[in-house]
Regions:
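N-terminal "assembly arms/tails" that initiate or stabilize quaternary assembly
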Residues: 1-80, 399, 403-405
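Hydrophobic, glycine-enriched assembly/anchoring segments
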Residues: 5, 92-95, 366-407
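C-terminal hydrophobic structural anchor segments
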Residues: 329-366
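Long, contiguous amphipathic alpha-helices that act as assembly "spine/axial" helices in icosahedral shell
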Residues: 57, 81-147, 153-172, 195-206, ...
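Short solvent-exposed strand/turn elements
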Residues: 286-321
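A sequence-level detector for low-complexity, Ser/Thr- and acidic-rich stretches
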Residues: 214, 225-227, 231, 267-273, ...
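Autoprocessing Asn-cyclization modules and mimics
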Residues: 174-297, 403-407
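Short, Lys/Arg-rich flexible segments
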Residues: 2-41, 93-105, 119-139, 391, ...
Length: 407
């Protein structure tokens, strides 16, 4: 994601414009998780979009490759993946907004506390929505440098390209660093980007503290079943399976991990069938814990390249048996992913009804919009600050979940 400062205003009020810029800076400073991201939407794409709706990003089809001179053209299958459009806001009276004319006082008493609070709420939601969108998992009994190495290696096995970032709980990073802080290689650019949360580079990944990461508690052993619907060719041979994005079972919780006993393996982003096992991670569950959403799995039969696949199975295998990978207990959760796997865009949505005197500021790719509203009941004006954005991991192959036993 490009990092830059820019200001656009609908008024000539320099003071308001400067204030919004300070708030935008305070928000951007707290969003470490999305600093490593790429843009997937343009301002034009945001036109007419509403908060809470989803936007489709398309995963390109790499097609199939044949050896020799004979060509065998195949259809192009672009896969849609949803990115949610969201908004976070904070508001205050115009008196509170205008009370502090001195920029330093305004920064300390308004921009920084409100910007930080807004940003942390926003960041926590983005983290919770995306930390389990992974196709691989590394599970360990204790924090160690080996955990960081294993997670980076899992990505390397898929030959993913680009910058790799690692987000772990500060407690986890503290325990790892106690075993040899000198193992972290400092990087000037990353230090400037992530500030005090940056530890250094290890195993090819920038290591970053993230206090907003969740924990996962397994109270009762979860069980799960996955239903596969075959896709047939003209001769009734199974060449793949319809996309799967749900599982059923018992004691399901967000973050639960299941394996398929080596029967389900990853097709990497270049279309190569790898030997890396797919780990199925629960994204969300129904209240009873009997049905769960998972990252979409597009399965092809070995050598068939059906439906822009991200996973493959051997011919003749048409069922999968899932086994829980997590024992009963509580786990710290971390994530190692590529910068390119996270899409983040923040632009000015359509104006809200009844608003006026709008100012917009962008810092670090994060846009903050200020609007004023009349409060007819109390005969006063309100200042509202909005951060409209779209964020999401659009391809789970670019991310690895890390589970470290806490208790």
């Amino acid at each position: 994601m490009a990092f830059y400062n820019s200001v656009a205003t609908a008024t000539n009020d320099f003071t308001n414009n400067k204030k919004v810029l300070l708030v935008a800076g305070a928000v951007a400073d707290e969003l470490d998780y999305i600093k490593a991201s790429v843009s997937k939407m343009s301002q034009e794409d945001f036109k007419g979009k509403k908060y809470g709706k989803s936007y489709n990003i398309y995963i390109p089809d790499v097609g199939s490759v044949k050896e020799g001179l004979e060509a065998s053209p195949d259809d192009i299958t672009e896969v849609e993946t949803e990115i949610k459009l969201n908004n976070f806001n904070t508001s205050c009276t115009i008196d509170a907004w205008n009370e502090l004319g001195d920029m330093e006082s305004f920064k300390d008493q308004v921009a920084k506390p409100r910007g930080q609070h807004l940003a942390r709420q926003m960041a926590k939601t983005i983290v919770n929505d995306n930390v389990f969108k992974d196709m691989q998992a590394v599970i360990a009994d204790a924090p160690s440098f080996g955990v960081l190495s294993d997670a980076s290696a899992a990505l390397n096995e898929l030959a993913v390209g680009g910058e790799v970032v690692s987000f772990m709980h500060p407690t986890v990073m503290g325990k790892i660093a106690a075993g040899g802080l000198a193992n972290f290689i400092p990087g000037t650019e990353a230090k400037e980007l992530y500030g005090k949360n940056y530890l250094g580079q290890y195993a090819g990944a920038e290591q970053i503290n993230c206090a907003l990461l969740p924990t996962v508690t397994i109270k009762d052993a979860p069980t799960a079943t996955i239903a596969l619907t075959p896709v047939k060719d003209g001769e009734s041979n199974t060449i793949g399976f319809e996309t799967v994005d749900t599982i059923t079972g018992a004691n399901l919780v967000p973050g639960a991990v299941f394996t398929a006993g080596g029967a389900l393996k990853i097709v990497d982003q270049s279309g190569i069938e790898t030997e890396q096992d797919v780990q199925i991670i629960v994204l969300s569950v129904n209240p009873e814990g009997t049905s769960a959403k998972i990252s979409p799995i597009r399965i092809t039969v070995e050598g068939k390249n059906t439906g822009n696949p991200n996973a493959w199975m051997k011919a003749g295998v048409e069922t999968l048996t899932l086994t829980s990978a997590l024992a009963v207990g509580t786990y710290w959760v971390g994530q190692v992913r590529t910068k390119e796997s996270m899409a983040f865009d923040s632009f000015k949505f359509e104006n809200l009804p009844g608003s006026e005197n709008e100012d917009v500021a962008t810092v670090g790719g994060v846009t903050v919009k200020m609007s004023t509203y009349g409060d007819g009941t109390n005969l006063t004006k309100l200042i509202r600050l909005d951060v409209p954005h779209a964020a999401g991991i659009w391809d789970a192959r670019g991310a690895v979940a890390v589970y470290i036993k806490k208790s």
